[in-house]
């Protein structure tokens, strides 16, 4: 009976340990425009991607952003050139397309993905600088 209790306890423990969230797995973190502003201010070389169309990007964008449109056929090909081991920040107009882009990046193996909550509209409503 003692052995049965011990085995049962071990099985239950292993079950709960296997259910624990893997903290090293890729995660998508929704962050505020202020957090993006701080990241850009602290590191001008960070991977900041505006996933809107070329026309939207041409109207206005964050100063150090590169434009890789998530709806373009070659989106995956272009982002594959970025460093998967470095943090990547994505944004769009309101947050929908960047959320989709973040999911694609996660599937592609990017380790640290930040999605700006509310997109460029939220950035503008906060009155933040660092725009082009």
Where are the regions a protein language model picked out?
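Rhodanese-like catalytic fold shared by cysteine-dependent sulfurtransferases
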Residues: 2-9, 16-39, 45-46, 55-87, ...
